[in-house]
């Protein structure tokens, strides 16, 4: 790989940092040696109605997996995110909303958000929603999505947020699995200038005869273009709140009462309903938000994630609002209407902390300096990356160009199932290496094990497991605890298996190498796809790459690389040879791709993750059953890749 050097902690950050290197060592030691004492103290970051006496009661034992934190305490999440801030910062902005159209933006104060949430909580009650009922939320990125989520939490209803890009079939599947009682949606969403037919998709989903639990659909008016309307079932948001009181006391919830269900794709294709509960989740979201982003009062924080993903739950809304932060919600995409939109939004709202995904960073990087044209970005202090491992070249570009070479990057590794950050730098405590998630957060005990579960000490590579529980951990899969145990605790007994591989370097830093099913075995050597992809993307003409293994009768697996070139570049036989030699030089002969497949589009989920399962099937010619493609942002990509594969000529 290209030489990785350490980025020291900038003096300007070190001076005011909440966590110093010494504090990190002290807290981390305490958190793993005496978790009850550590979390007993840290649990006070939020307000409890009835304080807890029991801190940790957890077991990873096969057949007895049980995760309980602060179990005798009671609280309300909405009261922690809203009510407790009113006296001190009621008039402070809670949410800055930036529309898809650059001319549309507004701010919502804590006082206003509290008013709107109480009002909508009463609407939910008037529609018969009770504590424990599940409410499906299928909304665009507007403040009302946050209002709906917080209103559910206020009355003890469980929300199941469905990303606004999912198809009617995917929506129906999630409504059926969770037994949702109500759907909250909008007439349409707007993204990159295009209308998203949310209400129409809900209408289509509700035609499924297996859905019997939905009595009403609440529709927020975003564009005014609602097509079909079913009287008696469909009700306008604005009509309902006219009648509603803004007085709604928060429901007292047990720490272990479910807060939300969030569906994540399973390897079998059937989505898994990950269940998070109230107390431990909020403690963990608030604490990780505060320390990982080194949040100081008044900082303007922008997480680009959609509310439909766990990042939108933990780090757009709940973590920031629990800490009384100012959080920016963005309806659009980072490159619309121009490729410098992300940079423009940073300047317009004087954003101090920016948290986005490698897929966005790589898309901007392909545009070069146009991505920062006419902008300064000098308000930025901290930047972050989430969603997948970020290759060192994209990390350095993000650091140098977007962050003006002065902002630490927190490259956070975590999952829907972990609730919050697991392995991550802390801005004032961690020297950075481009592409490394660095060290575990407090209370997180990672280990690397071989395929038999034997721990690998020191500098090593292996399966990434967590050996003990943390408060933000998911408790179960909705209605299927057996599948929860099977998926996460059966591969390596007594440990949580992340499904990811990682290596640990001489400094104890962790490098995520990708999903374990994305590890190639070439002539008996393990190669992480992330490493080969990083080498490919380091080539000056390559914008994006995805690597999969295909069977090879001598080497076991051959390396098949899908490659998207930068704008203006064309594939040639010469470039084919050049790229193969480039990887050979960067990593070694073993990692040389056997086949290059030029394409201008890769199959991505709506959260920007590349769907490698489909790429593997196309590469091996196994296209009879491509499985569930409903989560793809653009399903037509698959057909295009198949056509390209059929017409491919491999230079000799």
UniProtKB/Swiss-Prot annotation:
Mg(2+) binds at residues 537, 539, 542. Gene3D superfamilies: 3.30.300.30, N-terminal domain of ligase-like. The keyword Ligase applies. Signal peptide: none annotated. Belongs to the ATP-dependent AMP-binding enzyme family. Keywords: Acetylation, ATP-binding, Ligase, Magnesium, Metal-binding, Nucleotide-binding. It is an enzyme of class 6 (ligase). It catalyses: acetate + ATP + CoA = acetyl-CoA + AMP + diphosphate. It comes from the Bacteria. Catalyzes the conversion of acetate into acetyl-CoA (AcCoA), an essential intermediate at the junction of anabolic and catabolic pathways. Acs undergoes a two-step reaction. In the first half reaction, Acs combines acetate with ATP to form acetyl-adenylate (AcAMP) intermediate. In the second half reaction, it can then transfer the acetyl group from AcAMP to the sulfhydryl group of CoA, forming the product AcCoA. Its EC number is 6.2.1.1. Acetylated. Deacetylation by the SIR2-homolog deacetylase activates the enzyme. This is Acetyl-coenzyme A synthetase. InterPro entries: Ac_CoA_lig (IPR011904), ACAS_N (IPR032387), AMP-bd_C (IPR025110), AMP-bd_C_sf (IPR045851), AMP-binding_CS (IPR020845), AMP-dep_synth/lig_dom (IPR000873), ANL_N_sf (IPR042099). It comes from Yersinia pseudotuberculosis serotype O:1b (strain IP 31758). HAMAP family: Ac_CoA_synth. ATP binds at residues 387-389, 411-416, 500, 515, 526. GO terms for biological process: acetyl-CoA biosynthetic process from acetate; chemotaxis. One of its GO terms (cellular component) is cytosol. Its cofactor is Mg(2+). The modification N6-acetyllysine is found at residue 609. CoA binds at residues 191-194, 311, 335, 523, 584. Coiled coil: none annotated. Pfam families: ACAS_N, AMP-binding, AMP-binding_C. One of its GO terms (molecular function) is AMP binding.
